[in-house]
């Protein structure tokens, strides 16, 4: 039977752990961005039970957002973020990012459902939905309710824009 040191019993985790890449750390260390309410024990239990990683130590730090003035001149601060540095028993090496995307033609979907155009880290323009293609696919289905909902959506889109 395993011991649980954290406060919460996590059966199906609803906590998002974001692995931060690009920091100059030794291979036994990894940095995660976690919600503010997560503590060190929760991090250790999560990594141990979900990913079966043996954690040696956990160090956490809260980074405050920089102050700025909005358009009304009010001083605001964005939400703080918590980063956790985890030391593991076994070294961890990041997988290499793919350099060549020739296997996928532009416009085709990748196995995860994303588009080749949206693979850049910070996309400048969001991809526009091709309504003609959507309407053609819906018209292939001869369901009366779908056709009615398609017409309602088209009317709503015309009203807004």
Curated annotation (Swiss-Prot):
Belongs to the universal ribosomal protein uL23 family. GO terms for cellular component: mitochondrial large ribosomal subunit; mitochondrion. PANTHER family: LARGE RIBOSOMAL SUBUNIT PROTEIN UL23M, RIBOSOMAL PROTEIN L23-RELATED. InterPro entries: Nucleotide-bd_a/b_plait_sf, Ribosomal_uL23-like, Ribosomal_uL23/eL15/eS24_sf. Residues 1-34 form a transit peptide. It holds the Pfam family Ribosomal_L23. This is Large ribosomal subunit protein uL23m. GO terms for molecular function: structural constituent of ribosome. Its main location: mitochondrion. The keyword Transit peptide applies. Component of the mitochondrial large ribosomal subunit (mt-LSU). Mature yeast 74S mitochondrial ribosomes consist of a small (37S) and a large (54S) subunit. The 37S small subunit contains a 15S ribosomal RNA (15S mt-rRNA) and at least 32 different proteins. The 54S large subunit contains a 21S rRNA (21S mt-rRNA) and at least 45 different proteins. uL23m forms the wall of the exit tunnel. Interacts with the C-terminus of OXA1. It is found in: Mitochondrion. GO terms for biological process: mitochondrial translation. Keywords: Mitochondrion, Ribonucleoprotein, Ribosomal protein, Transit peptide. The keyword Transit peptide applies. Component of the mitochondrial ribosome (mitoribosome), a dedicated translation machinery responsible for the synthesis of mitochondrial genome-encoded proteins, including at least some of the essential transmembrane subunits of the mitochondrial respiratory chain. The mitoribosomes are attached to the mitochondrial inner membrane and translation products are cotranslationally integrated into the membrane.
């Amino acid at each position: 039977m395993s011991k649980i040191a954290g406060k919460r019993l996590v059966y199906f985790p609803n906590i998002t752990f974001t692995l931060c890449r690009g920091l100059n750390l030794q291979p036994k260390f990894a940095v995660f961005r976690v919600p503010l309410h997560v503590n060190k024990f929760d991090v250790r239990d999560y990594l141990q039970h979900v990913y079966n990683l043996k954690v040696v130590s956990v160090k956490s730090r809260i980074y405050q957002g920089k102050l700025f003035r909005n358009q009304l001149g009010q001083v605001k601060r964005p939400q703080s973020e918590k980063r956790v540095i985890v030391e593991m028993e076994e070294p961890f090496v990041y997988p290499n990012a793919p350099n060549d995307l020739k296997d996928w033609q532009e416009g085709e979907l990748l196995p995860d459902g994303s588009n080749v155009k949206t693979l850049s880290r910070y996309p400048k323009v969001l991809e526009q939905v091709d309504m003609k293609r959507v309407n053609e696919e819906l018209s292939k289905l001869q369901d009366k309710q779908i056709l009615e909902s398609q017409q309602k959506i088209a009317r709503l889109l015309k009203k807004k824009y």
